[in-house]
C-alpha cells in the first residue's frame, strides 16, 4: 500500500469501521447537539435504525441539572457505511469532514503528536511528523506555529483543515464558557461517569438557555454558525 505525505482518501472504509480509539469509553461517531436532528432524519429516510447517546456528562451542582457537551452515534461500523461507501457523504457530520485531523494546530501550543490524528492505515503519520515537521519521537521540540500550519496545509485538503478548525473552535468555546461561569460562581460543575436512572440529560446550549446564561437567539446563532 502506497504511503505518502499528501493525505488522500482512497475510500477503503476503515475510518467508518473503526471509529473510536481503543481506550475510548464511548464507542461510535461523535456528534454535536445540532447534528442530531439531521442525523435522525437522514437515518429515517434510509430506513436505518440508530441510537444516539449523550457523552461528556456534567452535573451542575447549583441547578442540579445534568447536561452534556456532546453525543455519540452508537455502533461500529458506522450504520451509514454500505459497500465501503458513506450513504450520507454529502451530509456527514463535522468529525467526518475533519478526518483524519483530530486536533487542529491552531488550538494547541505544543508540537503535534500522533494523538492529534485519527487512525488511517493509508497514511504514514509518523513520516509526516518526522519528514514534514522534523519531529522525532521522544525528543522535545519547539516549532513556529506558522511552520506547522504551512505543513498541514500542504498535506491535508482545505476542507479538512477548515472543518477541524471549526470543530476545535466549538470545543474551545464550550470550555471557555464553562470556565467563565465556574469562575464567576454561577455554576459548580462535576464530571459524571454514569447518569442515575430516570434523570434527564440536556444539551449544553439548552442548559445555558434554561439557566438564562444565553438567549434562544444566541443559542440558534451558535448552532447555525457551525451547522453543516
Range-by-range predicted roles:
Residues 1-228:
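Short loop/turn segments that flank or connect secondary-structure elements
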Amino acid at each position: 500500500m502506497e504511503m505518502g505525505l499528501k493525505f488522500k482518501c482512497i475510500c477503503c472504509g476503515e475510518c467508518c469501521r473503526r471509529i473510536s480509539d481503543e481506550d475510548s469509553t464511548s464507542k461510535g461517531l461523535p456528534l454535536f447537539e445540532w447534528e442530531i436532528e439531521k442525523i435522525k432524519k437522514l437515518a429515517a429516510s434510509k430506513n436505518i435504525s440508530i441510537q444516539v447517546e449523550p457523552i461528556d456528562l456534567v452535573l451542575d451542582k447549583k441547578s442540579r441539572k445534568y447536561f452534556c457537551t456532546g453525543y455519540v452515534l452508537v455502533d461500529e461500523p458506522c450504520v451509514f457505511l454500505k459497500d465501503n461507501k458513506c450513504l450520507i457523504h454529502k451530509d456527514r457530520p463535522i468529525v467526518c469532514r475533519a478526518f483524519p485531523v483530530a486536533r487542529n494546530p491552531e488550538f494547541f501550543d505544543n508540537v503535534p503528536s500522533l494523538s492529534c490524528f485519527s487512525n488511517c492505515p493509508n497514511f504514514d503519520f509518523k513520516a509526516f511528523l518526522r519528514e514534514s515537521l522534523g519531529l522525532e519521537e521522544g525528543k522535545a521540540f519547539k516549532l513556529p506555529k506558522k511552520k506547522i500550519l504551512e505543513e498541514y496545509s500542504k498535506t491535508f485538503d482545505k476542507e479538512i483543515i477548515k472543518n477541524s478548525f471549526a470543530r476545535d473552535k466549538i470545543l474551545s468555546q464550550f470550555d471557555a464558557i464553562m470556565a467563565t461561569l465556574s469562575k464567576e460562581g454561577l455554576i459548580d460543575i462535576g464530571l459524571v461517569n454514569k447518569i442515575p436512572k430516570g434523570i434527564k440529560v440536556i444539551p449544553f446550549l439548552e442548559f445555558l438557555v434554561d439557566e438564562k446564561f444565553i438567549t434562544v437567539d444566541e443559542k440558534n446563532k451558535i448552532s447555525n454558525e457551525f451547522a453543516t
